[in-house]
């Protein structure tokens, strides 16, 4: 007779004994008696799927970011080039660091402007007529000095005011021109953006409209900037300032010393210095 255990093994499905040896029954294939995908394998597969999705996402988004970065870098380079060119143009038209007050005609012009201002004040307030009437009433010469002192004091005050305020005005006008230029650039940029968005509905005329408005604003800013420059040049001539050119700058014969200071060296002193260096370099005689 056959052994009942052998019959039992034939009746039992495959993997029946292994079924109870596994702690998690849900992860077992009942037909083959094999373990299903373990959590580690499942985690690895999920990580691979996530990585594939992330790579797909980065492959689609990264080129767009690169294009945006290229555009922003081009805009930055364009703005930097525009700023450098404008600064060169501005420095050529407004030589603020090369203006000298050593012109001989400066004080003559300031005196003339002070006298003109006094005459204008006198014409408006009629100081001269009242002064002549006062002289006719008071025949004493000692009483005439009061109005004269007033005129002299007013003249000195105006002369010092013209001297000090003219320097401030000449220094402030280049800054005002920079403000005018940058305000014009900002207004032009905003107007171009607004007109481009409004005229975007009519694609055929959007470029023409934006270019026309930008050109009109640029022309207005240019006229204002040029008019400001004319005022600047007129004030330089009127107040007796002098623009120092490269030819006017005299190079002094100063040489740096060992302490970093500068000292005047004539031809005689240079020759004596060379002789001293030669004497120092000569070998000393050895005593026998």
UniProtKB/Swiss-Prot annotation:
GO terms for cellular component: cytoplasm; endoplasmic reticulum; membrane. Keywords: Cytoplasm, Endoplasmic reticulum, Membrane, Transmembrane, Transmembrane helix. It comes from Schizosaccharomyces pombe (strain 972 / ATCC 24843) (Fission yeast). InterPro entries: DUF999. The chain crosses the membrane at residues 107-127, 144-164, 174-194, 198-218. This is UPF0494 membrane protein C212.04c. Its main location: cytoplasm. The keyword Cell membrane does not apply. It is found in: Cytoplasm; Endoplasmic reticulum; Membrane. It is a multi-pass membrane protein. Belongs to the UPF0494 family.
């Amino acid at each position: 007779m056959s052994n009942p255990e052998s019959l039992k093994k034939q009746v039992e499905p495959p993997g029946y004994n292994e079924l109870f040896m596994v702690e998690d029954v849900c992860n077992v294939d009942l037909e083959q008696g094999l373990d299903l995908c373990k959590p580690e394998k499942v985690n690895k597969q999920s990580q691979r799927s996530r990585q594939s999705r992330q790579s797909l996402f980065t492959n689609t988004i990264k080129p767009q970011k690169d294009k945006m970065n290229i555009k922003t870098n081009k805009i930055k380079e364009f703005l930097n080039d525009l700023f450098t060119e404008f600064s060169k143009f501005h420095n050529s038209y407004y030589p603020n660091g090369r203006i000298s007050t050593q012109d001989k005609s400066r004080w003559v012009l300031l005196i003339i402007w002070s006298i003109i201002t006094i005459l204008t004040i006198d014409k408006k307030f009629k100081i001269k007529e009242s002064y002549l009437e006062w002289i006719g009433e008071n025949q004493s010469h000692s009483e005439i000095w009061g109005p004269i002192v007033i005129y002299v004091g007013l003249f000195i005050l105006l002369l010092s005011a013209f001297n000090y305020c003219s320097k401030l005005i000449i220094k402030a006008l280049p800054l005002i021109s920079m403000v005018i230029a940058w305000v014009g650039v900002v207004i032009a940029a905003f107007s171009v953006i607004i007109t481009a968005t409004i005229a975007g509905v009519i694609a055929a005329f959007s470029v023409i409209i934006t270019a026309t408005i930008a050109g009109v604003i640029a022309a207005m800013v240019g006229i204002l900037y040029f008019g400001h420059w004319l005022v600047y040049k007129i004030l330089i001539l009127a107040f007796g300032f002098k623009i120092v050119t490269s030819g006017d700058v005299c190079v002094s014969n100063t040489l740096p010393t060992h302490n970093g200071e500068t000292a005047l060296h004539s031809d005689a002193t240079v020759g004596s210095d060379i002789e001293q260096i030669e004497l120092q370099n000569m070998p000393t005689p050895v005593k026998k």
